[in-house]
Amino acid sequence: MKQLKRKRKSNFSVQETQTLLKEIKKRRDIIFSKQLNTTINEMKRKAWEEIAECVNALGEGEQRTGTEVKRRYLDWRALVKRKRLNSDVKLGGSAFHLPLSDLDDSINDDTDDKPSVLTSESSLEWKNVADVREASESMTEIKVEEEEDPQGFEGPSWKKRVSHPCLGIQLNARQNRILYNKTPSDEQFEIEEEDEMLSTVLPDSREENDLPEEFPRIEEFGTLSSIARIPYKESHLLVTLEKQKLELERQRLSIEAERLQVEKERLQIERERLRHLDMEHERLQLEKERLQIEREKLRLQVMHAEKPNLENDFAQSEKTVLQPLDIEAEKLKLEREHLQLEKERLQLLKFEFEKLHIEKERLQDALHLTFKHIPASCVACDLQDSQIHSATTFDGIKEKTNTLVPGS
């Protein structure tokens, strides 16, 4: 079996350690919660990942994970306890303790039943580079054993062991239990859950039911109880819930958009189908009208074929009825034209009469002039003859006029 070695990362710097402790203090309500269920464990895991992101934001060159940050805090806490135990042994078990760092004091100040450590400046200040180097050297050494054969590899069967050079801490990730060797006499105590061990790292005498007032209880199935609905003091809990809600809303909107797209396509297909149905309806309507016209045409042809004699009889009777009426009308029309011609002829005769009258007067004047040169007997004879001729002519014209226009 071939062992694959991983390159060891660099130690945590002073700024990374200080940032780590500050972020843990901000999230202590979640990290050190004594409730154990799926929801709390998930919230703890996300809290450690957020702390790792804050540490990586410093830009020290190493990308820390949530597990590495968690292990670093455990090592730092164990180192502080070891120094405190050593100081107790050297001082003969007196109540005087060596002063710890300011960040350790700030974390320990949150407890109720343990007094705070001394606040004076000391050589154990975390800002001292020597102490930081000493704490960094006591970091856990990671050894990962992997099998080369892929058939013999199983996901949950790999083991990760962490050995501490000072305390002899051994972590078995598969069994999820931690063994501590606090003294050289090999006294061991076992904690079944790793998350519960975190609650014992910081001294805290509060019971399970003595949680912060702002932190609502979480029931067995991971749902918030309706007893305490006060807003959380820490905003990251609300942020996590809002992120999950936004993700669900985003998925719902995506599904809704797909549904609307399918509905739009369905409506388009339905519109096309209706358009084809309208065209088919119009075509059938035109065909119906054409058949109606053909039917009327055939009916007329049948009627003309069956009743030709009736039509002929009707035409003859109509002619016989209209014939006498036409003759009378023609007669009246001819009479009217005849009267019109007679009237014109009378006008011509009247014009002739006037003309003759003028001629008579002229002749009378001429005779009057010739009386002086012709004897009286001859003149009298000629005048009498002319008067007789004129009288006969005038009487003839008058008789003709009376015969043409009676009563005039």
UniProtKB/Swiss-Prot annotation:
InterPro entries: MSANTD4 (IPR026162), Myb_DNA-bind_5 (IPR028002). Residues 236-367 form a coiled coil. Keywords: Coiled coil. The keyword Coiled coil applies. Residues 4-77 form the Myb-like domain. This is Myb/SANT-like DNA-binding domain-containing protein 4.
